[in-house]
Amino acid sequence: MTDRLKCLIWYCIDNQNYDNSIFYSERLHAIEDSNESLYLLAYSHFLNLDYNIVYDLLDRVISHVPCTYLFARTSLILGRYKQGISAVEACRSNWRSIQPNINDSISSRGHPDASCMLDVLGTMYKKAGFLKKATDCFVEAVSINPYNFSAFQNLTAIGVPLDANNVFVIPPYLTAMKGFEKSQTNATASVPEPSFLKKSKESSSSSNKFSVSESIANSYSNSSISAFTKWFDRVDASELPGSEKERHQSLKLQSQSQTSKNLLAFNDAQKADSNNRDTSLKSHFVEPRTQALRPGARLTYKLREARSSKRGESTPQSFREEDNNLMELLKLFGKGVYLLAQYKLREALNCFQSLPIEQQNTPFVLAKLGITYFELVDYEKSEEVFQKLRDLSPSRVKDMEVFSTALWHLQKSVPLSYLAHETLETNPYSPESWCILANCFSLQREHSQALKCINRAIQLDPTFEYAYTLQGHEHSANEEYEKSKTSFRKAIRVNVRHYNAWYGLGMVYLKTGRNDQADFHFQRAAEINPNNSVLITCIGMIYERCKDYKKALDFYDRACKLDEKSSLARFKKAKVLILLHDHDKALVELEQLKAIAPDEANVHFLLGKIFKQMRKKNLALKHFTIAWNLDGKATHIIKESIENLDIPEENLLTETGEIYRNLET
């Protein structure tokens, strides 16, 4: 498998697909912990402008010349001259006798093939909002080359139904090749039928092989957004993500940043090259990707010779065996990524955990696990996994905005502040860093400062949907509901499957009393992520407001089954049971809730109410007293209930004021 992985890594590097080269380099380094595999991983990160990650990877490598040279180049960019000099001087005896290799063969270097061109074309279509065309491009890219993992991830992000078992199969034209170094001329003439698309009843009879992808893309790009046309039309075009105004601001920022010694130049000609870098819609400042950029061009000839000699020793049969093994591994990765994109979280978790242990301990898998636990609302476990990722790759900023949100939910201000400090120090031009800082200010209820940080993040990347969603929540916290709705709509324009923005719009309408609009947006979010207990609870809240208690109870019960530890869903369920005069079942729910949230005054207050109604005065007094001790602000309500302990109440939920605030929001 290692030979095939090395071929794939160089193939990805030749085609400037650095996300894929990082992905395969991680797989190789997990299997073969050697200087060569470490160099390939570091070199891929270097080409991806992840200089701090390169520095961390190569900091302790002593005698390997290519690694030392790459470390020196990285130290030069980061301004850490002393460390670079020490590393180069330490292995002087190893590189002093190396002769220039000007006549090194370039026959193994290739040009972008159809799959690479389709991948970058699809990425541009996706960023421009043409999801149907983007889907067609990605489908064809994966059909031509199943090793194109970034195209596969783009398909999962769009929401196309896929079957990973049928995606990651060796195409016929590849089985006749000894390796990737042979020409692939006319390879597209034998493009396999994209059988990996899951057929729906509506599209199974269609003769167009891309009919499924068209229907999926259209469902998100047209029907789902049509109801919001009038709202989007009201938004000033200059404020929309990716508008001329913001692109001008972004270019201005890039121009200003040239004075930084650690920041490289950026120009318009490189935009197309940067579009194929990441499906998470981030932007970075990049430098020209020319052959002169390659820092190891002279010192990696030994690696290339070793690679060529290994190819000479490898037989077509051995390559086929490696391809088969690698495809089995990719099927597991593909299933996990697809299931996570579909929010089938338990299945995704099982899939990632079924990977070989060395693969589980790589940044890619740890990030996916952290996101999976986060979506499962298991913030403690998510924090644990993300912290492991931070220990493994301390300079990584990708996906750290999810980590910061988990810390925000856990109310852990110190770790969140530390994370914000570290990410800003190592990645000051990353939008994720500024969103993390915004979460830090938000936790301190400094919403104005948080909004300033978010605006900076949007300047750096006008297509970062998380920033718009966070901006919407901060405006909502300031009761600026119109601005909040505008921000959430911008997030949806960037990514129509970003369910958090649909949820945010629903909450704004819920707060402003527009129950029908709130229900529509919650339902839309739940269509994207049907396994989120919070969304199901919010739909139940709409029915509760409309006094349809039985329907509300159905949704609360479903939410409790999705997340047994959801205090909000269980509390709402108990309240509805009380409204239906089913006090015994309500008591059971509250007892379970007490075990989940023993320090929640609301729970004890409601328990006291029920015991009072059941004429169990001692238990009622006990829980009223506990509630009093836990929430001193609600003493007037609790005191009144204690004073009227002998007077039965017709409606136990008449007093739903201050004491319910924590669980109601």
From Swiss-Prot:
DNA-binding region, as residue ranges, is located at 191-257
Example GO biological process term?
A: cell division
Q: Where are the transmembrane segments?
A: none
Query: What keywords does the record list, in alphabetical order?
Result: Cell cycle, Cell division, Mitosis, Nucleus, Repeat, TPR repeat, Ubl conjugation pathway
Q: Where are the TPR repeats?
A: 115-148, 329-362, 363-396, 431-464, 466-498, 499-532, 534-566, 568-600, 601-634
Q: Cite the GO molecular-function annotations of the record.
A: DNA binding
What Pfam families does the annotation carry? ANAPC3, TPR_1, TPR_19, TPR_8
What the entry lists under SMART domains is as follows: TPR (SM00028)
Q: Which PROSITE patterns match?
A: TPR (PS50005), TPR_REGION (PS50293)
Q: Which domain of life is it from?
A: Eukaryota
Q: Which InterPro entries match?
A: TPR-like_helical_dom_sf (IPR011990), TPR_rpt (IPR019734)
Q: Does the keyword Membrane apply?
A: no
Give the quaternary structure.
The APC/C is composed of at least 13 subunits: apc1, apc2, nuc2, apc4, apc5, cut9, apc8, apc10, apc11, hcn1, apc13, apc14 and apc15. Interacts with apc10 and cut9.
Q: Which family does it belong to?
A: Belongs to the APC3/CDC27 family.
Q: What is this protein called?
A: Anaphase-promoting complex subunit 3
